């Protein structure tokens, strides 16, 4: 029997969402890659997405679901900010509620309705210790000894590292970078030996104390139109460096997220839109 999926996106960062309340979903990495592969000019390929998301029955009291994420390369992802908003919206729609909580491998997340297809999610506190990223060696994560390019004229250097349930490194740049720059530099840094689990790479331009321009090279997915945890990491990194206030607009080419690193409890709060694209059926070979 084929399985129904929902295609959703947050600022163009797109997902195949599979609800498993009545039928388990235990895909192989090959099946995830088959689903995520974007169709070519010949029409061959999968559905196409940055991440695959499974919404499972809850495993703990107080949660509406247990949620799993995979990157398009087939590897399990610890967290996904834009995907979290999409999941929160779906669960709220299903329950007829304005607030919801669900569990992930990275911990419990919660979301509240903030308007028409606008969702605010509590992403929890960031991980700032080198062991939480993780890094291969002890290091001050506010000023990491890393650079790309010639020693006397590096392209980017001295980034900040943050965990948002997944590892991020944020480079501050004097001007917004091009897609080609983000691809070339991001792909190099993603697999740097300093990051034993790989890393998401952000390039953040501080436009003002409440405005960041951002591009993100996602671990296992490549250059994406938007990255929710990347936006959270960029804002946390900027606050740590004294570059922005606690609340800022993080802008991608496709739109903006509002990110607040709340001083009262240290949690990162993200507000942004979701888009429901369509529903479909998985091909039999990848229905898992």
From Swiss-Prot:
SUPFAM superfamilies xrefs: Diaminopimelate epimerase-like (SSF54506)
GO annotation, cellular component aspect: cytosol
Residues noted as binding substrate in the record, renumbered to the chain: 13, 51, 71, 81-82, 166, 200, 218-219, 228-229
UniProt xrefs under Gene3D superfamilies: Diaminopimelate Epimerase, Chain A, domain 1
Pfam families, alphabetized: DAP_epimerase
Keyword Mitochondrion: no
Predominant place of localization: cytoplasm
EC category name: isomerase
Annotated site (Could be important to modulate the pK values of the two catalytic cysteine residues): 168, 218
Pathway(s) it belongs to: Amino-acid biosynthesis; L-lysine biosynthesis via DAP pathway; DL-2,6-diaminopimelate from LL-2,6-diaminopimelate: step 1/1
Keyword tags: Amino-acid biosynthesis, Cytoplasm, Isomerase, Lysine biosynthesis
E.C. number(s) listed in UniProt: 5.1.1.7
Localization per record: Cytoplasm
Reaction it catalyzes: (2S,6S)-2,6-diaminopimelate = meso-2,6-diaminopimelate
Active site residues of this protein: 80 (proton donor), 227 (proton acceptor)
A GO MF label: diaminopimelate epimerase activity
Annotated InterPro entries: DAP_epimerase_AS, DAP_epimerase_DapF
Assembly and binders: Homodimer.
Function: Catalyzes the stereoinversion of LL-2,6-diaminopimelate (L,L-DAP) to meso-diaminopimelate (meso-DAP), a precursor of L-lysine and an essential component of the bacterial peptidoglycan.
Assigned protein family: Belongs to the diaminopimelate epimerase family.
UniProt-recorded name of the protein: Diaminopimelate epimerase
Species the sequence originates in: Caulobacter vibrioides (strain NA1000 / CB15N) (Caulobacter crescentus)
Name of encoding gene: dapF
